[in-house]
From Swiss-Prot:
Annotated metabolic or biological route of this protein: Purine metabolism; IMP biosynthesis via de novo pathway; 5-amino-1-(5-phospho-D-ribosyl)imidazole-4-carboxamide from 5-amino-1-(5-phospho-D-ribosyl)imidazole-4-carboxylate: step 1/2
Protein encoded by which gene: purC
SUPFAM superfamilies registered for this protein in UniProt: SAICAR synthase-like
HAMAP family xref list: SAICAR_synth (MF_00137)
Pfam family, one: SAICAR_synt
Record InterPro entries: SAICAR_synt/ADE2_N, SAICAR_synthase_Vibrio-typ
Protein's recorded name: Phosphoribosylaminoimidazole-succinocarboxamide synthase
Keywords: ATP-binding, Ligase, Nucleotide-binding, Purine biosynthesis
Source organism per UniProt: Aliivibrio salmonicida (strain LFI1238) (Vibrio salmonicida (strain LFI1238))
Length: 367
């Protein structure tokens, strides 16, 4: 089987029984189950959710997204071998660790296949919960341009690139484009202050103003748990993005949970600790791929300037990236996943066929 056939690039065409449109994101696709199938699985599998809770099948792909574009490689390679399974395995590992440390639950109810989660529908908090322990990336670029206030927080002068910050910095941004919120620009991923959230907590989908402190607590606790575990395997947790939402448990009680993925090479920066101590940065995350793209194309401003999105999409569509770059990234994902989970990631020969088989035979979700 060829390399391109091992990659799951298209994940929104599976014959999963649903009566709603499939939601296809940059990396994951979501199939909302029928009310009948949701109720049946909750009863059969004993999921700790309300009997009428809507469930979904979430299928990850191997697609690679960077700078808001999907990239492809030479030879018809439409994704990164092993990426989807690696991301899910890492998230599964951290969510279990959160549970072991008595943190909040996640939206995941079941894991039928390395590419698949069965999830409970949640009401999302409309915030990208970003936190930073080091000054790097976009924050460093803004700092070099003279910015000293980030999301309402003043940071000191004379910081150096990639320096550890004295405290974990919470720098939230909007999740999508939010309209009608005073002082918040109607664009995607705009930075917001805690005051913005407090003044408009219901617009950000918080159930109460007190839950702002709860989300911050869960963000800090989750970061600390992952940071300690990564430190134990000589890695540094540099920065990350969490997402949160509300669900009801089996008794009908509303609770704030972790959503999406956590602590992955896509949602975080992870550095090699020993290299950092000797003054070098070795990226064990997607950041290395972003740096490759910035160096690969003659006009990196196209990738950084949101006013040049048409040019950026054309760049991603019209250019096949070197196979070596795609495979280097594959190695990054597979290696860091093996370090974190303690087990190698097994590559599927035909992930799509495997997914259909397990959902048909064990969950009766394919006709």
């Amino acid at each position: 089987m060829s390399l391109s056939e091992q990659v799951l690039a298209v994940n929104d065409d599976l014959p999963i029984r649903t009566d709603k449109p499939v939601h296809s994101g940059k990396v994951r696709s979501v199939y909302w189950l029928t009310e009948e199938d949701s109720r049946r699985l909750i009863k059969e599998k004993g999921y700790n959710v309300a009997p009428d809770a809507p469930l979904a099948i979430m299928v990850i792909s191997d697609r690679i997204s960077a700078f808001d574009c999907i990239w492809h490689g030479e030879g018809g390679l439409k994704g990164i071998p092993g990426k989807g399974a690696a991301l899910n395995a890492i998230s599964n590992h951290w969510f279990q660790l959160f549970k072991d440390n008595n943190l909040a639950d996640s939206h995941i109810l079941d894991i039928p296949h390395p590419f698949v989660w069965i999830v409970q529908k949640a009401k999302p908090v409309m915030i990208e919960a970003i936190c930073r322990q080091y000054i790097t990336g976009s924050m460093w670029r803004a700092y070099t341009n003279g910015e000293r206030e980030f999301c309402g927080i003043q940071i000191p002068e004379r910081l150096e690139k990639d320096e550890e910050l004295a405290d974990l910095l919470l720098t939230p941004s909007t999740k999508g484009v939010l309209k009608g919120i005073e002082g918040v620009s109607e664009v995607d991923d705009v930075n917001i202050t805690r005051k913005d959230i407090e003044n408009n907590f219901s617009a950000f989908n918080f159930s109460s103003i007190e839950d702002i402190a709860l989300y911050e607590k869960l963000l800090k606790e989750g970061f600390a748990v992952i940071s300690k575990a990564l430190n134990d395997i000589d890695q540094i947790f540099v920065d990350t993005k969490f997402e949160f939402g509300y669900v009801n448990d089996a008794q009908g009680n509303e609770k704030l949970i972790y959503m999406d993925e956590v602590g992955t090479p896509d949602s975080s920066r992870i550095w090699d600790k020993n290299a950092y101590r000797s003054g070098h940065i070795i990226e064990n995350s997607k950041e290395g791929f972003r740096q490759f793209l910035l160096n690969h194309f003659p006009e990196p401003d196209i990738l950084l300037n949101k006013n040049r999105m048409d040019e950026r999409f054309a760049l991603a569509t019209e250019n096949s990236l070197p196979l070596e770059a795609m495979m280097d990234l594959s190695k990054t994902y597979l290696d860091i996943a093996a370090k974190i989970t303690g087990a190698p990631i097994m590559l599927s020969d035909n992930p799509k066929a495997e997914i259909i088989k397990v959902l048909k035979e064990q969950y009766q979700l394919v006709d």
